[in-house]
UniProtKB/Swiss-Prot annotation:
Residues 1-29 are annotated as: Disordered. Residues 11-21 have a biased composition (Basic and acidic residues). Induction: Expressed in the early phase of the viral replicative cycle. InterPro entries: Poxvirus_F8. Residues 1-10 have a biased composition (Basic residues). This is Protein OPG052.
């Protein structure tokens, strides 16, 4: 029982450390160096859950008649 509590605390500490800092827009040098890779967004699990939270009806594709 103590182990599960400890694990939960460490997970909460990780989430606190992963608070996104305000992103400065990349400088022209960085854009020239890395190209489009700055536009690639890393999704957090919460964002993925929100994206996948649509009702099944929307994603359901009815068979052609």
């Amino acid at each position: 029982m103590e182990g599960s509590k400890r694990r939960h605390d460490s997970r909460r500490l990780q989430q606190e450390q992963e608070q996104p800092r305000p992103r400065t827009p990349p400088s022209y040098e960085e854009i020239a160096k890395y190209g489009h890779s700055f536009n690639v967004k890393r999704f957090t699990n919460k964002e993925m859950c929100l994206k996948n939270d649509y009702p099944r009806i929307i994603s359901y594709n009815p068979p052609p008649k």
